Regions:
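Short beta-strand-to-turn element immediately C-terminal to the catalytic PLP-Schiff-base lysine
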Residues: 110-115, 174-177, 186-189, 212-214, ...
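Flexible, small-/acidic-enriched active-site or ligand-binding loops
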Residues: 144-147, 162-164, 189-222
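A short core secondary-structure module
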Residues: 159-194
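Structural signature of FAD isoalloxazine-binding scaffolds in flavoprotein oxidoreductases
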Residues: 78-87, 142-145, 187, 215-217, ...
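A short, Trp-centered hydrophobic/proline-enriched beta-strand micro-motif
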Residues: 127-138
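Alpha-helical interface subdomain recognition
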Residues: 1-94, 113-117, 128, 233-379
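Cytochrome P450 C-terminal beta-domain/meander region
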Residues: 143-157
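Short, flexible active-site-proximal loops enriched in glycine and acidic residues
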Residues: 94-103, 221
């Protein structure tokens, strides 16, 4: 274990990467474009499968962003987690409709598997194979041992629930129980004997599905009894990357709402003149800064090989979930009546935050986990 740097956050390389991502999303992923893709009049039928720009995803792959944290030996770039955090933050700020965050989560899980088959799958991700996790049971449990899928003779049977970006993904990393415990398995989205059923969710920039397996062929990534350990090892990175996306989305909401309160006139004064508006916006800013510090600290502790990575990551996700609810609700409220309409861009980011809020456990769930870690489980 190495000592964590006192000045954690972005180095020169990560700062350049963040600036590059900011310019890319500004040029190619404006709120107006996103609104045109995903927002429709609710009286008109809207497909529950998210509309997204596949050519833009290919550009992301060509920029090397899917490979950023993958080890060089597996065909990646081999940068630290903070590099992916820099990209995820800007992706959240753009509400980028893509399987990027889901693919990062799968990447960290595959890295934790540390097997030849997992390394090969990482190389495929580096070249653009979108991959997502299918690890949740019907009850929505995020525990690594809870799965409704079983494996017998190398074939999967059962249902994986709440699979993120399932309709955009080429592959699934599936947790399944066997005689000797939970293992992890790779399944192609086009494989026989699987059925991907899209679910409706609040977030307009993502899709979600449940996947049924009926003796589906799979490739073992982590042996029975090792799959849950790989998921546990990857969870700090997963929580950190989701929290980074929330930071970016929160910053967009704050910036947009602040600008609106400068131009919206009420009682012959800009809306931002009134303390009832000023003070909550300052609190949102402080909430975002606290979250950002915890996210950067979490990423840095993971990169430095600290022993308290889970503690840091759950602190970051707990704060990020609280920030998401507060920042997005204030953004809607301060936009007034227009904020509740389909014409307003704010609701797209609001809904992304509400989805992120519960993804891999909301603030209450994270604090319960933290209490168990710090105080100990109740008898």
């Amino acid at each position: 274990m190495t000592e964590q740097p006192k000045n954690f956050g972005f180095g020169e390389d990560e700062t350049m990467l963040k600036d590059s991502a900011q310019k890319f999303f500004s040029d190619n992923c404006s709120p107006d474009k996103i609104h045109g893709q995903v927002a429709h009049d609710p009286s008109i039928h809207r497909p529950i499968e998210t509309i997204w720009d596949k050519s833009l995803w290919q550009q992301v792959v060509e920029l090397g962003w899917t490979a950023v944290c993958i080890p060089e030996a597996a065909g990646g770039i081999g940068m630290p987690l903070v590099a992916a955090v820099a990209i995820a933050e800007e992706a959240g700020k753009a509400a980028f409709p893509s399987p990027l965050i889901s693919t990062y989560c799968a990447t960290f899980t595959l890295m934790a598997c540390d097997t030849d088959t997992a390394n090969k799958a990482l190389g495929d991700i580096a070249t653009g194979t979108a991959t997502t996790l299918a690890i949740t049971n019907r009850d929505g449990s995020w525990e690594s041992t809870d799965t409704d899928v079983s494996v017998v003779d190398g074939k999967l049977t059962g249902t994986a629930w709440f699979v993120q970006d399932a309709k955009k993904s080429d592959r699934f990393v599936v947790s399944a129980k066997g005689e000797n415990g939970v293992g992890l398995y790779l399944v192609e989205a086009t494989a026989a004997n699987i059925d991907i059923i899209a679910d409706g969710i609040i977030d307009l920039t993502r899709d979600q599905a449940h996947i049924t397996f009926d003796a589906a062929q799979c490739t073992e990534l982590a042996a029975q009894g090792a799959g849950d350990k790989a998921l546990d090892a990857a969870m700090p990175s997963i929580l950190t990357i989701v929290s980074a996306d929330m930071v970016g989305t929160g910053e967009w909401l704050l910036q947009t709402t602040t600008e609106y309160t400068k131009t919206r006139v009420q009682f012959d004064r800009p809306l931002g003149f009134f303390q009832a508006v000023k003070h909550p916006l300052v609190n949102v800013m402080l909430d975002i800064d606290r979250t950002k510090s915890l996210v950067y600290n979490s990423a840095c502790s993971i990169d430095s090989g600290e022993s308290n990575t889970e503690l840091n990551a759950r602190m970051a996700k707990s704060q990020a979930s609280d920030m998401a609810v507060f920042s997005s609700s204030r953004a809607i409220q301060f936009h007034g009546g227009i904020g509740f309409t389909w014409e307003c861009f704010v609701h797209i980011f609001f809904k992304r935050q509400m989805h992120n809020h519960v993804l891999y456990g909301d603030a209450k769930y994270q604090r319960a986990k933290l209490a168990d870690m710090v105080i100990g489980k109740a008898a």
